[in-house]
From Swiss-Prot:
This is Calpain small subunit 1. Homodimer or heterodimer of a large (catalytic) and a small (regulatory) subunit. In presence of calcium, the heterodimer dissociates. Ca(2+) 1 binds at residues 107, 110, 112, 117. The lineage of its organism: Eukaryota, Metazoa, Chordata, Craniata, Vertebrata. Residues 94-128, 137-170, 167-202, 203-231, 232-266 form the EF-hand domain. It comes from Oryctolagus cuniculus (Rabbit).
Length: 266
């Protein structure tokens, strides 16, 4: 069993909201309109297999600890239960009804959003915002975003899953613009902690450094698609930790199958 300990403060807050209405053209721009990678390296060297294994375990332990430290007190709103997009509640606001109509146009005949459809949606939106520096959302990034939001493991996003993701993207896009103080279109390493804290993630220095190595360029600058991809993954990991920490002890135990499910489908 893996024992994951938590001993530092976490973040608060979950999905954002607002700005859902309008026709397809207006909504695509309005939903995302702002309010106003390199990978890590591995250790090497001689000393035998036992030493290498020890190094790997220390690295893995550090990753687990850094994540659990930040997740312990994170209190996001979980995505609502999955329902068909046409199941309109009597007290539903006109804004949400408009979003249902938008979803019906975006999702296609199966009324679910695939990774390819999500990629097309996001890339259409970011082209309307030249102040957001991005290389565009790639298919692999969107597959990962779908996977970590896919609560029922269908491989696609239903209405509530998509709405939760979309609300978060809108909130995080506003934060991105707010903390891009030099208007470079990117967030640099010194701007990153403030942006992440505004999004509800209070991380330690070790985890910030890991994120910069994974999601930023060689100069330490993070563009918009990497910023969103990183926050989607953090949000999902924190929600997973909270759901497994049923007693609120700041510790979870998972077997190897649960661990693989958490880490491989993401």
């Amino acid at each position: 069993m893996f024992l994951v300990n938590s001993f530092l403060k976490g973040g608060g807050g979950g999905g954002g909201g607002g700005g859902l209405g309008g026709g397809l053209g207006n909504v695509l721009g309005g939903l995302i309109s702002g309010a106003g990678g390199g990978g890590g390296g591995g250790g090497g060297g001689g000393g035998g297999g036992a030493g290498g294994g020890g190094t790997a375990m220390r690295i893995l332990g550090g990753v687990i600890s850094a994540i659990s430290e930040a997740a312990a007190q994170y209190n996001p709103e979980p995505p609502p239960p999955r329902t068909h997009y046409s199941n309109i509640e009597a007290n539903e606001s006109e804004e949400v009804r408009q979003f249902r109509r938008l979803f019906a146009q975006l999702a296609g005949d199966d009324m679910e959003v695939s990774a390819t459809e999500l990629m097309n949606i996001l890339n259409k939106v970011v082209t309307r915002h030249p102040d957001l520096k991005t290389d565009g959302f790639g298919l692999d990034t969107c597959r990962s975003m779908v996977a970590v939001m896919d609560s029922d493991t269908t491989g696609k996003l239903g209405f509530e899953e998509f709405k939760y993701l979309w609300n978060n993207i809108k909130k995080w896009q506003a934060i991105y613009k707010q903390f891009d103080v030099d208007r470079s279109g990117t967030i640099c390493s010194r701007e990153l902690p403030g942006a992440f804290e505004a999004a509800g993630f209070h991380l330690n220095e070790h985890l910030y450094n890991m994120i910069i190595r994974r999601y930023s360029d060689e100069a330490g600058n993070m563009d918009f698609d990497n910023f969103i991809s990183c926050l989607v993954r953090l949000d999902a990991m924190f929600r997973a930790f909270k759901s497994l920490d049923k007693d609120g002890t700041g510790q979870i135990q998972v077997n190897i199958q649960e661990w693989l499910q958490l880490t491989m489908y993401s």
